[in-house]
Amino acid sequence: MLHREGTGLISMRSERSQEPAIIFFDIDGTLVTHRADVPPGETVVFGVPSPGVVEAFRRLRERGHLAFICSGRPRRLVYPPVLELETAGSVLSAGACLMIGDEVIEDRFVDTGTLDRILEGFERERVSVMLEGTDECVTFMPEGSSDRLTLPHATIARTVDEVHAVSTMRFSKFAFYNDEIPKFERVGDLLSEHFVRYDLGLGVSEMTLKDVDKGHGVRRVLETLGRDRTRTFAFGDSENDLPLFSAVETSVAMGNAMPSVKEAAAYVTDSVADDGVVTGLEHFGLI
């Protein structure tokens, strides 16, 4: 476990306020362990927080702190073991869908015309992606493309017309295996014009709209709650957590985090497999 002092670091001895802390938690690689020998899609469906994490969330609630999920996952892919943590709300789809309690305060999607043109390019170049929206996910798998990127019970579409037929076209982002990236240049400039790519680790990336990320989502949630950055914390492990870190006062990287994420953090805790979330919360006197 590493510890680095920084301007954002708050210790138990230097609390400036007794107001409840607000803590934002990534899911994959932070609350839930991803094993390298298990396909990412299976972990999304079957991964569960450890008993230590469940108890830590109970203690946070007991102390009056507000815990939020802050994940690239859409609401459709947040399963009961995570929902049962009983959070105060969620920043989902990497900042596109924002919830306080059960109320959705913002839900943003890719323009349908833009999405159509991108999917036409993916179909032409045989690029396989997981299209993710708040309430629906579709594996776009053109003929001749890779069949690895799927989830149990996922809807599969082979053509743009099929995507229209099986969905409402309300998608906010898409995920893919990194070996698809060389094909993206042949798709055209629409991707670089409208999207940012984040490496999620384990050979998988996601693309989100340029003006939508976890940092945007956190700032909107804090604004809605009437709070500034004081006594706000974030736990994360991958590139899409960097905007999240910029939106809070104190950032905590997991011990299994990417090097760039550790470098950006005020504090590096233990790995997800060693209950690093629990260690970090204890370090800051939050539980």
Language model regions located:
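Mg2+-dependent phosphoryl-transfer enzymes with acidic/Ser/Thr/Gly-rich catalytic loops
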Residues: 13-14, 18-22, 50-51, 206-287
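Asp-based phosphoryl-transfer active-site loop
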Residues: 21-39
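Basic, amphipathic juxtamembrane/active-site segments
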Residues: 35-59, 253-255
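Active-site phosphate-binding/coordination module
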Residues: 48-147
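Short active-site oxyanion
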Residues: 62-68, 86-88, 172-174, 230-232, ...
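Short, structured coil segments at secondary-structure junctions
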Residues: 85-86, 94, 190-194, 247-248, ...
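Short hydrophobic/aromatic-enriched beta-strand-loop microsegments
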Residues: 87-95, 107-108, 149-151, 197-199, ...
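Conserved acidic, metal-coordinating active-site core of Asp-based
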Residues: 125-247, 256
